[in-house]
Amino acid sequence: WEPVRTPYALGELMVKATPLLIIALGLAVCFRSNVWNIGAEGQFVMGAVTAGGMALMADKNTGIWIIPAILLAGVLGGMVWAGITALLRDKFNASEILVSLMLVYVAILVLNYLVFGPWKDPAGYNFPQTRTFEKITQIPRLMTGSRMSVGLLIALAGSAALWIFLFRTRAGFAQQVGGLAPAAARYAGFSSRKALWVALLVSGGAAGLAGALEVAGPIGQLTPYVPAGYGFAAIIVAFVGRLHPVGMVFSALLMSMLYIGGELAQSRMGLPKSL
């Protein structure tokens, strides 16, 4: 129970849970629509890259508007990256599983090119990283002495919004029918093509938002270690939570405890990371 013993440890648990929950919420839209987006990790990375680029443009005189701009840049970065998968599936019937998965490695290569090249901090002792973002660009924190940010509130608000969308709106019903039963959807006047695009763009936008919150929050700069596996772990979070907005809140907390427990096992017991 070490991850919940102290306020600081609880804050670290929420730091891990926030990106997992946000990405899982987007993936739930995909999976409920029978669209298999396996590349949320790549969309997370591209959201971090575009958000990081926006943050690097800021200086000490930049206004508070920069934080919404960073988050919007992250959302758009993730949506564009997921849109590539949607386009190839829509126009050429390419497998979204393979395309989205391969784009993960392309996104990581883009990140590495930037932090080893044009965005590398000249005062960073040759380490592959950007300069630390200005304080004005950092996501506000919820507790003093903790890294827990308002990203947690965004994640919880997203969970509530998804519940309303899926179970209380006609658009949410059409989204699920369009993916799960294309023939029935066409008969009812719903578009399975629209369901594909909405699912991937929402999922990509959520992953990109998580990436933006991560680099403008706990990390505070771009490094090669931004890809932390959250995009893949969120698939587990989504299914353990049974693709339900409330269930995924609890599964995200469970997965976060496993993350932190694994890190403690590595540092204190010397267990290899592969275990």
For each feature predicted by the language model, list its residue ranges.
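Transmembrane alpha-helical segments in multi-pass inner-membrane proteins
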Residues: 201-275
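Membrane-helix interface residues
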Residues: 34, 92-94, 169, 190, ...
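Single transmembrane alpha-helix segments in multi-pass membrane proteins
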Residues: 1-58, 71, 75, 79-97, ...
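Transmembrane helix-bundle core of multi-pass membrane transporters
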Residues: 3, 7-8, 96-168, 221, ...
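Hydrophobic positions within alpha-helical transmembrane segments of bacterial inner-membrane proteins
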Residues: 25, 29, 48, 71, ...
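Hydrophobic alpha-helical segments embedded in the membrane of multi-pass proteins
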Residues: 17-28, 43-45, 49, 79-83, ...
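Helix-loop-helix "hairpin" substructures at the membrane interface of multi-pass membrane proteins
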Residues: 60, 143-221, 245-246, 250
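Structural signal for membrane-spanning alpha-helices in multi-pass inner-membrane proteins
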Residues: 23, 27-31, 51-56, 86, ...
